[in-house]
Amino acid sequence: MSKNKFLFTSESVSEGHPDKMCDQISDAVLDAHLAQDPHAKVACETVTKTGMIMLCGEITSKAVVDYQVLVRNVIKKIGYDDSSKGFDYKTCNVLVALEQQSPEIAAGVHVDKDIADVGAGDQGIMFGYATDETEEAMPLTLLLSHKLNYKLHELRRSGELEWVRPDSKTQVTIEYSSEGGACVPLRVHTVVISTQHSPDISLEDLRKELIEKVIKVVIPGNLIDNDTVYHLNPCGSFVVGGPMGDAGLTGRKIIVDTYGGWGAHGGGAFSGKDPTKVDRSAAYAARWVAKSLVKAGLCRRCLVQVSYAIGVAKPLSVMVFSFGTSALNEAELLKIVNDNFDLRPGMIIKNLDLKRAIYEPTAENGHFGHNDFPWEQARKLKIDKDLRAKSKGPALVDAIGIAH
Protein backbone atom coordinates (compact mmCIF):
# COMPACT_ATOMS: atom_id res chain seq x y z
CA MET A 1 0.00 0.00 0.00
CA SER A 2 1.30 3.46 -0.93
CA LYS A 3 2.51 5.71 1.89
CA ASN A 4 -0.35 8.10 1.06
CA LYS A 5 -2.97 5.35 1.32
CA PHE A 6 -4.57 4.04 4.50
CA LEU A 7 -7.50 1.95 5.73
CA PHE A 8 -10.21 3.28 8.03
CA THR A 9 -13.23 1.48 9.49
CA SER A 10 -16.55 2.65 10.95
CA GLU A 11 -19.49 0.69 12.32
CA SER A 12 -23.22 1.23 12.75
CA VAL A 13 -26.01 -0.59 14.56
CA SER A 14 -29.69 -0.92 13.72
CA GLU A 15 -32.73 0.51 15.48
CA GLY A 16 -33.30 -2.94 17.00
CA HIS A 17 -29.89 -3.15 18.66
CA PRO A 18 -30.52 -3.08 22.44
CA ASP A 19 -28.47 0.08 23.01
CA LYS A 20 -30.13 1.90 20.11
CA MET A 21 -33.52 0.72 21.35
CA CYS A 22 -32.75 2.46 24.66
CA ASP A 23 -31.61 5.61 22.87
CA GLN A 24 -34.89 5.79 20.97
CA ILE A 25 -36.98 5.28 24.10
CA SER A 26 -35.03 7.98 25.96
CA ASP A 27 -35.53 10.42 23.09
CA ALA A 28 -39.21 9.49 22.78
CA VAL A 29 -39.58 10.44 26.46
CA LEU A 30 -37.81 13.74 25.75
CA ASP A 31 -40.04 14.46 22.74
CA ALA A 32 -43.20 13.67 24.71
CA HIS A 33 -42.26 16.28 27.30
CA LEU A 34 -41.10 18.94 24.83
CA ALA A 35 -44.30 18.53 22.80
CA GLN A 36 -46.31 19.64 25.83
CA ASP A 37 -43.74 21.79 27.62
CA PRO A 38 -40.92 23.28 25.49
CA HIS A 39 -39.12 24.34 28.68
CA ALA A 40 -39.02 20.82 30.14
CA LYS A 41 -35.73 19.71 31.64
CA VAL A 42 -35.12 16.07 30.83
CA ALA A 43 -32.32 13.62 31.61
CA CYS A 44 -33.75 10.17 30.91
CA GLU A 45 -31.75 6.96 30.79
CA THR A 46 -33.18 3.63 29.64
CA VAL A 47 -32.06 0.11 30.51
CA THR A 48 -33.32 -3.09 28.90
CA LYS A 49 -32.87 -6.82 29.31
CA THR A 50 -35.14 -9.76 28.51
CA GLY A 51 -38.76 -8.70 29.02
CA MET A 52 -37.88 -5.52 30.91
CA ILE A 53 -37.51 -1.79 30.30
CA MET A 54 -36.47 0.64 33.04
CA LEU A 55 -36.58 4.43 32.81
CA CYS A 56 -34.41 6.34 35.28
CA GLY A 57 -33.25 9.90 35.59
CA GLU A 58 -34.42 13.41 36.38
CA ILE A 59 -37.28 15.33 34.75
CA THR A 60 -38.85 18.68 35.59
CA SER A 61 -41.85 19.28 33.34
CA LYS A 62 -45.47 20.37 33.20
CA ALA A 63 -46.24 17.58 30.74
CA VAL A 64 -48.34 14.54 31.58
CA VAL A 65 -46.84 11.46 29.93
CA ASP A 66 -48.08 7.86 29.96
CA TYR A 67 -44.73 6.08 30.03
CA GLN A 68 -46.28 2.63 29.72
CA VAL A 69 -47.93 3.49 26.41
CA LEU A 70 -45.00 5.51 25.12
CA VAL A 71 -42.40 2.81 25.74
CA ARG A 72 -44.52 0.04 24.24
CA ASN A 73 -45.22 2.12 21.13
CA VAL A 74 -41.51 2.65 20.50
CA ILE A 75 -40.78 -1.07 20.90
CA LYS A 76 -43.67 -1.93 18.58
CA LYS A 77 -42.41 0.51 15.95
CA ILE A 78 -38.95 -1.04 16.09
CA GLY A 79 -40.49 -4.45 15.37
CA TYR A 80 -40.24 -6.41 18.60
CA ASP A 81 -43.74 -7.86 18.64
CA ASP A 82 -43.07 -11.45 19.69
CA SER A 83 -40.81 -13.06 22.28
CA SER A 84 -39.31 -15.26 19.55
CA LYS A 85 -37.66 -12.09 18.20
CA GLY A 86 -36.04 -11.32 21.55
CA PHE A 87 -38.69 -8.96 22.94
CA ASP A 88 -42.44 -8.36 22.92
CA TYR A 89 -43.91 -4.90 23.46
CA LYS A 90 -47.19 -6.41 24.62
CA THR A 91 -45.82 -8.41 27.56
CA CYS A 92 -42.69 -6.56 28.70
CA ASN A 93 -42.44 -5.00 32.14
CA VAL A 94 -41.92 -1.20 32.16
CA LEU A 95 -40.37 0.21 35.35
CA VAL A 96 -40.22 3.96 35.99
CA ALA A 97 -37.70 5.61 38.34
CA LEU A 98 -37.82 9.27 37.31
CA GLU A 99 -37.35 12.14 39.78
CA GLN A 100 -37.24 15.96 39.70
CA GLN A 101 -34.14 17.79 38.49
CA SER A 102 -31.90 19.09 41.29
CA PRO A 103 -33.05 22.60 42.31
CA GLU A 104 -29.38 23.57 42.75
CA ILE A 105 -28.66 22.81 39.10
CA ALA A 106 -31.82 24.62 38.00
CA ALA A 107 -30.89 27.75 39.97
CA GLY A 108 -27.37 27.83 38.56
CA VAL A 109 -28.27 27.11 34.96
CA HIS A 110 -31.57 28.62 33.84
CA VAL A 111 -33.95 29.93 36.54
CA ASP A 112 -34.72 33.68 36.11
CA LYS A 113 -32.15 34.07 33.33
CA ASP A 114 -32.50 35.65 29.89
CA ILE A 115 -31.94 33.24 27.01
CA ALA A 116 -28.51 34.70 26.23
CA ASP A 117 -27.43 34.13 29.84
CA VAL A 118 -28.57 30.52 30.21
CA GLY A 119 -25.62 28.60 31.56
CA ALA A 120 -24.29 25.27 30.38
CA GLY A 121 -26.08 22.35 32.04
CA ASP A 122 -22.73 20.78 32.88
CA GLN A 123 -19.03 21.13 32.23
CA GLY A 124 -17.54 19.26 29.31
CA ILE A 125 -15.90 19.21 25.90
CA MET A 126 -17.75 18.72 22.62
CA PHE A 127 -16.55 18.20 19.05
CA GLY A 128 -17.93 18.72 15.57
CA TYR A 129 -16.45 17.29 12.38
CA ALA A 130 -17.04 17.61 8.65
CA THR A 131 -15.31 16.34 5.51
CA ASP A 132 -15.85 16.99 1.82
CA GLU A 133 -15.62 13.29 0.87
CA THR A 134 -19.44 13.03 0.62
CA GLU A 135 -22.26 15.42 -0.24
CA GLU A 136 -23.48 15.08 3.35
CA ALA A 137 -20.03 16.21 4.59
CA MET A 138 -19.82 12.93 6.53
CA PRO A 139 -17.17 10.18 6.48
CA LEU A 140 -18.03 7.61 3.82
CA THR A 141 -17.15 4.71 6.13
CA LEU A 142 -19.92 5.71 8.55
CA LEU A 143 -22.37 6.82 5.87
CA LEU A 144 -22.26 3.42 4.15
CA SER A 145 -22.49 1.58 7.47
CA HIS A 146 -25.65 3.55 8.32
CA LYS A 147 -27.11 2.95 4.86
CA LEU A 148 -26.56 -0.81 5.06
CA ASN A 149 -28.54 -0.95 8.31
CA TYR A 150 -31.25 1.27 6.89
CA LYS A 151 -31.61 -0.94 3.81
CA LEU A 152 -32.05 -3.98 6.07
CA HIS A 153 -34.71 -1.98 7.93
CA GLU A 154 -36.51 -1.14 4.66
CA LEU A 155 -36.45 -4.71 3.37
CA ARG A 156 -37.72 -6.05 6.70
CA ARG A 157 -40.55 -3.50 6.87
CA SER A 158 -41.61 -4.09 3.27
CA GLY A 159 -41.64 -7.87 3.74
CA GLU A 160 -39.19 -8.43 0.89
CA LEU A 161 -36.79 -10.08 3.33
CA GLU A 162 -39.18 -11.65 5.82
CA TRP A 163 -36.39 -13.51 7.60
CA VAL A 164 -34.65 -10.31 8.75
CA ARG A 165 -35.22 -9.36 12.39
CA PRO A 166 -34.64 -5.99 14.07
CA ASP A 167 -31.15 -6.43 15.56
CA SER A 168 -28.17 -5.91 13.25
CA LYS A 169 -24.67 -4.45 13.06
CA THR A 170 -22.68 -3.28 10.05
CA GLN A 171 -19.08 -2.24 9.50
CA VAL A 172 -17.28 -0.80 6.46
CA THR A 173 -13.54 -0.48 5.84
CA ILE A 174 -12.47 1.92 3.09
CA GLU A 175 -9.09 2.43 1.48
CA TYR A 176 -8.34 6.15 1.36
CA SER A 177 -5.77 8.37 -0.24
CA SER A 178 -4.44 11.28 1.82
CA GLU A 179 -4.21 14.42 -0.30
CA GLY A 180 -2.87 17.44 1.54
CA GLY A 181 -4.78 16.54 4.69
CA ALA A 182 -8.01 15.68 2.84
CA CYS A 183 -9.31 12.11 2.67
CA VAL A 184 -10.28 10.70 -0.72
CA PRO A 185 -12.11 7.32 -0.77
CA LEU A 186 -10.62 4.91 -3.32
CA ARG A 187 -12.40 1.59 -2.75
CA VAL A 188 -14.35 -0.47 -0.24
CA HIS A 189 -11.91 -2.89 1.35
CA THR A 190 -14.22 -4.88 3.68
CA VAL A 191 -17.93 -5.10 4.49
CA VAL A 192 -19.23 -6.75 7.67
CA ILE A 193 -22.92 -7.42 8.30
CA SER A 194 -24.32 -9.40 11.22
CA THR A 195 -28.10 -9.50 11.22
CA GLN A 196 -30.57 -11.27 13.44
CA HIS A 197 -32.72 -13.67 11.44
CA SER A 198 -35.51 -16.21 11.69
CA PRO A 199 -34.42 -19.84 12.18
CA ASP A 200 -35.79 -21.00 8.83
CA ILE A 201 -33.19 -19.47 6.48
CA SER A 202 -29.90 -21.15 5.67
CA LEU A 203 -26.64 -19.28 6.12
CA GLU A 204 -25.92 -19.72 2.41
CA ASP A 205 -29.20 -18.08 1.36
CA LEU A 206 -28.81 -15.34 3.96
CA ARG A 207 -25.38 -14.38 2.65
CA LYS A 208 -26.53 -14.43 -0.95
CA GLU A 209 -29.47 -12.13 -0.24
CA LEU A 210 -27.32 -9.74 1.79
CA ILE A 211 -24.96 -9.35 -1.16
CA GLU A 212 -27.62 -9.02 -3.86
CA LYS A 213 -30.32 -7.02 -2.05
CA VAL A 214 -28.35 -5.00 0.46
CA ILE A 215 -24.67 -4.52 -0.39
CA LYS A 216 -24.98 -4.17 -4.17
CA VAL A 217 -27.88 -1.75 -3.76
CA VAL A 218 -26.22 0.45 -1.14
CA ILE A 219 -22.54 0.56 -2.09
CA PRO A 220 -21.66 2.22 -5.42
CA GLY A 221 -20.33 -0.31 -7.89
CA ASN A 222 -17.20 1.71 -8.63
CA LEU A 223 -16.10 1.27 -5.01
CA ILE A 224 -16.34 -2.54 -5.04
CA ASP A 225 -13.83 -4.77 -6.80
CA ASN A 226 -12.76 -8.41 -6.87
CA ASP A 227 -10.61 -7.89 -3.79
CA THR A 228 -13.41 -6.54 -1.60
CA VAL A 229 -13.84 -8.80 1.44
CA TYR A 230 -17.27 -9.77 2.82
CA HIS A 231 -17.94 -11.10 6.32
CA LEU A 232 -21.68 -11.81 6.41
CA ASN A 233 -22.94 -13.25 9.70
CA PRO A 234 -19.37 -14.48 10.22
CA CYS A 235 -20.25 -16.05 13.58
CA GLY A 236 -22.96 -18.16 11.93
CA SER A 237 -26.49 -18.37 13.31
CA PHE A 238 -27.90 -15.16 14.87
CA VAL A 239 -31.45 -16.07 15.94
CA VAL A 240 -31.23 -14.90 19.55
CA GLY A 241 -30.96 -11.11 19.41
CA GLY A 242 -32.33 -7.91 20.84
CA PRO A 243 -32.44 -7.55 24.64
CA MET A 244 -32.60 -11.33 24.99
CA GLY A 245 -29.11 -11.56 23.51
CA ASP A 246 -27.58 -8.48 25.14
CA ALA A 247 -28.55 -5.91 27.73
CA GLY A 248 -29.10 -2.40 26.40
CA LEU A 249 -28.36 1.04 27.83
CA THR A 250 -28.80 4.62 26.64
CA GLY A 251 -25.62 6.33 25.50
CA ARG A 252 -23.42 3.36 24.66
CA LYS A 253 -23.17 4.01 20.91
CA ILE A 254 -21.65 7.49 20.93
CA ILE A 255 -19.25 6.81 18.04
CA VAL A 256 -22.03 5.36 15.89
CA ASP A 257 -24.07 8.46 16.76
CA THR A 258 -21.36 10.88 15.62
CA TYR A 259 -18.53 10.34 13.11
CA GLY A 260 -17.63 6.67 13.22
CA GLY A 261 -14.27 7.24 14.89
CA TRP A 262 -13.21 10.19 12.73
CA GLY A 263 -12.57 13.59 14.29
CA ALA A 264 -12.90 13.33 18.06
CA HIS A 265 -15.49 12.79 20.79
CA GLY A 266 -15.85 14.54 24.13
CA GLY A 267 -17.46 11.51 25.78
CA GLY A 268 -20.97 12.82 26.41
CA ALA A 269 -23.94 10.95 24.98
CA PHE A 270 -26.93 12.69 23.39
CA SER A 271 -30.16 10.75 23.80
CA GLY A 272 -32.61 11.53 26.58
CA LYS A 273 -31.12 14.99 27.20
CA ASP A 274 -32.94 18.28 26.64
CA PRO A 275 -30.98 21.01 24.79
CA THR A 276 -29.80 22.82 27.94
CA LYS A 277 -27.43 19.86 28.25
CA VAL A 278 -24.43 21.01 26.20
CA ASP A 279 -23.36 17.39 25.69
CA ARG A 280 -26.08 17.47 23.08
CA SER A 281 -26.74 21.04 21.93
CA ALA A 282 -23.10 22.14 21.77
CA ALA A 283 -22.12 18.99 19.86
CA TYR A 284 -24.86 19.81 17.36
CA ALA A 285 -23.61 23.40 17.14
CA ALA A 286 -20.01 22.26 16.64
CA ARG A 287 -21.14 20.07 13.73
CA TRP A 288 -23.09 23.07 12.34
CA VAL A 289 -19.91 25.17 12.46
CA ALA A 290 -17.68 22.49 10.92
CA LYS A 291 -20.11 21.71 8.11
CA SER A 292 -20.64 25.40 7.35
CA LEU A 293 -16.89 25.94 6.96
CA VAL A 294 -16.49 22.92 4.68
CA LYS A 295 -19.54 23.75 2.57
CA ALA A 296 -18.27 27.33 2.19
CA GLY A 297 -15.08 25.92 0.64
CA LEU A 298 -12.91 27.32 3.42
CA CYS A 299 -11.43 23.88 4.15
CA ARG A 300 -11.87 20.29 3.04
CA ARG A 301 -11.89 18.82 6.54
CA CYS A 302 -12.72 20.56 9.78
CA LEU A 303 -12.67 19.68 13.48
CA VAL A 304 -14.24 22.05 16.00
CA GLN A 305 -13.89 21.78 19.78
CA VAL A 306 -15.88 23.79 22.31
CA SER A 307 -15.78 23.58 26.12
CA TYR A 308 -18.02 24.78 28.96
CA ALA A 309 -18.32 25.11 32.74
CA ILE A 310 -21.61 24.37 34.50
CA GLY A 311 -23.73 27.48 34.96
CA VAL A 312 -21.49 29.62 32.71
CA ALA A 313 -22.93 30.79 29.39
CA LYS A 314 -19.82 31.75 27.45
CA PRO A 315 -17.70 28.85 26.13
CA LEU A 316 -14.37 28.49 27.91
CA SER A 317 -12.62 27.73 24.63
CA VAL A 318 -13.32 27.27 20.94
CA MET A 319 -10.84 25.54 18.61
CA VAL A 320 -10.92 25.09 14.82
CA PHE A 321 -8.53 22.69 13.05
CA SER A 322 -8.46 22.25 9.26
CA PHE A 323 -5.92 19.39 8.93
CA GLY A 324 -3.91 21.62 6.57
CA THR A 325 -6.72 21.79 4.01
CA SER A 326 -7.33 25.54 4.22
CA ALA A 327 -5.60 28.59 2.78
CA LEU A 328 -6.44 30.24 6.10
CA ASN A 329 -4.69 29.51 9.36
CA GLU A 330 -6.55 28.32 12.45
CA ALA A 331 -6.72 31.80 14.00
CA GLU A 332 -8.31 33.18 10.83
CA LEU A 333 -10.83 30.35 10.69
CA LEU A 334 -11.64 30.96 14.35
CA LYS A 335 -12.30 34.63 13.61
CA ILE A 336 -14.83 33.59 10.96
CA VAL A 337 -16.48 31.25 13.48
CA ASN A 338 -16.66 33.95 16.14
CA ASP A 339 -18.09 36.43 13.63
CA ASN A 340 -20.85 34.05 12.52
CA PHE A 341 -21.81 31.78 15.44
CA ASP A 342 -22.93 32.46 19.02
CA LEU A 343 -22.02 29.35 20.99
CA ARG A 344 -23.66 30.29 24.28
CA PRO A 345 -26.13 27.48 25.13
CA GLY A 346 -29.21 29.71 25.11
CA MET A 347 -28.32 31.15 21.72
CA ILE A 348 -27.60 27.70 20.28
CA ILE A 349 -31.07 26.62 21.42
CA LYS A 350 -32.64 29.74 19.91
CA ASN A 351 -30.77 29.70 16.58
CA LEU A 352 -31.29 25.98 15.96
CA ASP A 353 -34.83 26.00 17.41
CA LEU A 354 -34.06 23.07 19.68
CA LYS A 355 -37.01 23.24 22.10
CA ARG A 356 -39.09 21.06 19.79
CA ALA A 357 -40.01 17.38 19.72
CA ILE A 358 -37.45 16.48 17.04
CA TYR A 359 -35.15 14.04 18.80
CA GLU A 360 -36.40 10.48 18.45
CA PRO A 361 -35.37 10.27 14.75
CA THR A 362 -31.81 11.25 15.69
CA ALA A 363 -31.52 8.07 17.75
CA GLU A 364 -32.38 5.78 14.84
CA ASN A 365 -29.60 6.17 12.28
CA GLY A 366 -27.07 8.76 13.40
CA HIS A 367 -27.38 12.36 14.59
CA PHE A 368 -25.47 13.85 11.65
CA GLY A 369 -25.66 13.70 7.87
CA HIS A 370 -29.46 13.95 7.61
CA ASN A 371 -30.63 17.19 6.04
CA ASP A 372 -33.89 17.24 8.02
CA PHE A 373 -31.99 18.25 11.16
CA PRO A 374 -31.46 22.02 11.64
CA TRP A 375 -27.77 21.69 12.54
CA GLU A 376 -27.22 20.10 9.12
CA GLN A 377 -28.25 23.32 7.31
CA ALA A 378 -24.93 25.00 6.51
CA ARG A 379 -24.98 28.68 7.44
CA LYS A 380 -24.11 31.29 4.82
CA LEU A 381 -21.02 32.91 6.29
CA LYS A 382 -20.14 36.58 6.49
CA ILE A 383 -16.41 36.87 5.80
CA ASP A 384 -14.46 40.11 5.73
CA LYS A 385 -12.85 41.13 2.46
CA ASP A 386 -9.23 40.31 3.35
CA LEU A 387 -10.01 36.81 4.61
CA ARG A 388 -12.27 36.13 1.66
CA ALA A 389 -9.47 37.06 -0.72
CA LYS A 390 -6.97 34.90 1.14
CA SER A 391 -9.37 31.95 1.30
CA LYS A 392 -9.24 31.79 -2.50
CA GLY A 393 -5.46 31.68 -2.48
CA PRO A 394 -3.05 29.03 -3.81
CA ALA A 395 -3.09 26.77 -0.75
CA LEU A 396 -6.80 26.08 -1.03
CA VAL A 397 -6.70 25.77 -4.81
CA ASP A 398 -3.90 23.22 -4.52
CA ALA A 399 -5.73 21.25 -1.83
CA ILE A 400 -9.07 21.16 -3.58
CA GLY A 401 -7.79 20.99 -7.13
CA ILE A 402 -10.21 23.61 -8.39
CA ALA A 403 -10.36 27.39 -8.37
CA HIS A 404 -13.12 29.07 -6.38
UniProtKB/Swiss-Prot annotation:
Q: In which pathway does it act?
A: Amino-acid biosynthesis; S-adenosyl-L-methionine biosynthesis; S-adenosyl-L-methionine from L-methionine: step 1/1
Xref: Gene3D superfamilies:
3.30.300.10
CDD domains noted in UniProt: S-AdoMet_synt
EC code(s) of this entry: 2.5.1.6
Q: How is the cofactor bound?
A: Binds 2 magnesium ions per subunit. The magnesium ions interact primarily with the substrate.
Give me the residues that bind Mg(2+), please: E11
Residue positions binding ATP: H17, D167, S168, K169, C235, G236, S237, F238, D246, R252, K253, A269, K273, K277
* NCBIfam families listed in its UniProt record: metK
Q: What is this protein called?
A: Probable S-adenosylmethionine synthase 5
Organism equals: Caenorhabditis elegans
